[in-house]
């Protein structure tokens, strides 16, 4: 598991204090113990992921690109989503999903993937699970926002900046105003 934390700097009150304040606020709003947060400098994509297991303390890893491109609200949403994944024990299933070779943008813990065929039922179950777990994580992210009504603007802003989520999904040129009208 140590390859997950290579070239990482731990967030704290002295290093990345703005991010540390966001993490504390999200943990408080979700009634969660403050997770460890790392900023990882060796990733080539703007991604965020969380890790937790019986042998690893719950932690969130932000790529340096995410830290540099995101506004405070966008970071609050992303960190809130990862806190939700930790709170709901989604981390193990998320890591299992990475080995399905779902698409080339999916986060992979190391440069290898599962080469054998995966049972169709297992594949379908994990893909469906990801869809519903992501809704739960987004709800946690919305709870963490100072202005939850800004969710659509925050999420479209992230994707329009080139954000690729943990599952490899990306969506450029999202129409914020069109989505807001549909939501009304």
Segments and roles (model prediction):
Residues 1-51, 56, 120-126, 162-163:
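Hydrophobic or amphipathic, alpha-helical segments that drive membrane association/targeting
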Residues 14, 61-77, 128-131:
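Short pre-active-site segment immediately N-terminal to the catalytic Zn-binding motif
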Residues 14-20, 26-31, 109-180:
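Short helix/loop segments within enzyme catalytic domains
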Residues 36, 91-98, 147-156:
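Acidic/histidine metal-binding catalytic segments
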Residues 70, 79-88, 136, 140:
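Active-site His/Glu-centered metal-binding helix of metallohydrolases
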Residues 82-103:
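Catalytic Zn2+-binding segment of zinc metalloproteases
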